[in-house]
Amino acid sequence: MKVISSIQELRDQLRGQNRTAFVPTMGNLHEGHLSLMRLARQHGDPVVASIFVNRLQFGPNEDFDKYPRTLQDDIEKLQQENVYVLFAPTERDMYPEPQEYRVLPPDDLGGILEGEFRPGFFAGVCTVVTKLMSCVQPRVAVFGKKDYQQLMIVRRMCQQLALPVEIVAAETVRDEDGLALSSRNRYLTPDERREAPELAKTLQRVRDSVLGGERDLGKLEQHAHTHLAERGWVPDYIAIRRRANLIAPSAAELEAGEPLVVLAAAKLGATRLIDNLEI
């Protein structure tokens, strides 16, 4: 596996490749990330991964400086997955001058849920993903469903900007107790780690209620919010939305069996966790 930091060297290395499968990450890789590499291999060859902690998608009170950086360990994991190239640029490589141009998602998708609680987050994501796509020029890129809203925004962005890349969605990987794998799980204290699976269990109960015929979605959302708060969580949102556009479904759409997803974000101690389940 070649480890490359220069954009020009990356382009030279990939010149002539027309089936490249790309997996962008911020590093601190776990089994969830590695499952993306394996899925990428099913859709293209060679597989290219990137590791770049993107300052543009962190807010002023977020954890950019303490975000775990474990490059050597990540390299060893990617070598075991037979990744062809790891693109690991420095901040100077990616942003040699102030990034004055940004890719802004529409407010109807980028300003809700995560976008409401993390202003500027999706503009940072869209900008860096567009730049990475320009560097790698993949045929396929793999994104996890755990970041459901991000997946939808990136997919729509590629469609509307006519980027010639297929976005493949990967299922969320979970620990045995149901907690979705995340680099931020390492911030949890032992007691918080024991409590953390309750987020997924709460979403499962919401899903079961909807599938069981409950149609008062607002009541389900409020009950879930209250349940988590009573256990010491600080929920940002619990929302049942249409999978197609993350808009709340109408009564007619519910009766017609519109595909739904329940999404949540909540703080447990100092750690903010997100999760979702398709319904």
UniProtKB/Swiss-Prot annotation:
Chain positions recorded as ATP binding sites: 26-33, 144-147, 173, 181-184
Superkingdom classification of source: Bacteria
Subcellular location: Cytoplasm
Enzyme class label: ligase
CC per GO annotation: cytosol
Catalytic reaction equation(s): (R)-pantoate + beta-alanine + ATP = (R)-pantothenate + AMP + diphosphate + H(+)
Gene3D superfamilies on file: HUPs, Pantoate-beta-alanine ligase, C-terminal domain
InterPro entries noted in UniProt: Cyt_trans-like (IPR004821), Pantoate_ligase (IPR003721), Pantoate_ligase_C (IPR042176), Rossmann-like_a/b/a_fold (IPR014729)
Keywords: ATP-binding, Cytoplasm, Ligase, Nucleotide-binding, Pantothenate biosynthesis
EC numbers, comma separated: 6.3.2.1
The keyword Nucleotide-binding is assigned to this record: yes
Catalytic residue positions: 33
Subunit-structure text: Homodimer.
Described function: Catalyzes the condensation of pantoate with beta-alanine in an ATP-dependent reaction via a pantoyl-adenylate intermediate.
Protein name, as recorded: Pantothenate synthetase
Native species: Burkholderia cenocepacia (strain ATCC BAA-245 / DSM 16553 / LMG 16656 / NCTC 13227 / J2315 / CF5610)
Lineage: Bacteria, Pseudomonadati, Pseudomonadota, Betaproteobacteria, Burkholderiales
